[in-house]
Design a protein with these regions (language model features):
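Long lumenal/extracellular ectodomains of secretory and single-pass membrane proteins
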Residues: 1-211, 223-356
């Protein structure tokens, strides 16, 4: 509540008006509906109210000392440019998990990492495996932070403009996070677009290129799913030879070296049917070209299901696309992704597992 009192013209008061919640703490309701802070209101409301009145960094630090559970979103924007504010938030435990990863660039920009002790403490947190596990951080979260802070002029995926200790911690966290990805435990076939256009621009929702995000997802599937194949849309639909032990840069070099063909989203099903390969979930990752063949992918999926006797699912991810239609809206076994943000991998896994 205290993080998002309003967003996109909607307020918490609108939520109350439309949802008619029951059993709400009267002091919370009074605050949301009328802006009144009653004496019996929870501490976090008193803290939020106090933070709205501060006019200086010292005022922020004083409120954070009295109300350590306040998140950074409660602090006036113009006072978030001081490193001491972020250090206080960090030491209050408010910069953990995704909050820490998302704010790496901001902390670097305001020179917070010039404090060597803070840089070490922060690096320890973002690379800590207990924190990764508890926060359910995905490799894509780390990849996004790394590519968002990429060193200008560098082409290697893992080079950044960050201090070495933070850069190394992001790398360590990226590789450590794979072991905590919850698998779908399905036989998964990934078809990956290897065309040059995958290296142009960023995926919608990420700071990474479609090629980088696709390579990270290939690594995720290879390292977490017990049964998988990673194929490329080259001149033929070919096995890319992606193994669990490969690094992101090595996967990128592998895909960049392939000659490419059109991204025909029906090919994975046609190839699997022709070769009698049993697949539970087909995943296609491309930039925006989602249908370059004569047969609609959904028709190929239906044929595969009928002839193999497997209720296979199909997810098509257009990382730079703002709209396409592959999935049948009436078929729960198909899903289209337009763009690919840091929440998308979990949605994909839940879809593959049949949880959604």
């Amino acid at each position: 509540m205290e993080k998002e009192m309003s967003r996109n013209t909607w307020t918490m008061r609108d939520v109350f008006r439309l949802s008619h919640p029951k059993g709400v703490n009267p002091a919370i309701a009074e605050f949301i509906l009328r802006g009144e802070v009653l004496e019996e209101a929870p501490d976090i409301i008193h803290g939020y109210d106090a933070m709205t009145k501060v006019t200086s960094v010292n005022g922020v630090l004083s409120v954070l000392e009295g109300y350590p559970n306040l998140p950074w979103e409660t602090i006036p924007t113009h006072l978030l440019n001081d490193p001491e504010v972020w250090k206080a938030l960090f030491h209050n435990g408010q910069l953990r998990g995704q909050n820490a990863i998302r704010n790496v660039g901001r902390l670097n920009k305001i020179n917070a990492f010039d404090d060597m002790v803070f840089a070490r403490e922060f690096a320890n947190v973002i690379a800590d495996e207990d924190n990764i596990k508890a926060s359910r951080l995905h490799p894509i979260n780390y990849l996004n932070a790394i590519t968002a802070n990429r060193q200008p002029g560098y082409y290697e995926v893992m080079e950044t403009a960050l201090p070495g200790i933070v850069h190394d911690a992001l790398n360590d966290g990226f590789h450590a996070s794979f072991k905590y990805v919850k698998p779908a435990n399905k036989r998964t076939l990934l078809g990956l677009d290897v065309s040059a256009s995958m290296t142009w621009g960023n995926a919608i929702g990420l700071s990474a290129t479609p090629a980088e995000a696709g390579a990270a997802m290939a690594m995720t599937i290879a390292r977490t799913e017990p049964y998988y194949a990673v194929m490329g849309f080259s001149r033929r639909f070919v096995d890319l030879g992606i193994s669990p032990g490969m690094t992101l840069d090595s996967v990128m070099r592998k895909t960049n070296s392939m000659s490419f063909g059109g991204t025909d989203c029906s090919l994975p099903m046609e190839w699997a049917l022709k070769n009698k390969v049993e697949v539970d979930t087909f995943v296609v990752i491309t930039d925006s070209e989602t249908w370059a063949g004569r047969k609609h992918p959904y028709q190929a999926l239906v044929k595969y299901r009928q002839q193999m006797g497997i209720p296979a699912r199909l997810a098509v991810i257009g990382m730079t696309s703002t709209g396409f239609t592959i999935a049948d809206p009436s078929d729960r076994g198909t899903m289209d992704f337009c763009g690919f943000d840091t929440n998308a991998p979990r949605v994909l896994t839940d879809f593959s597992a049949g949880r959604i």
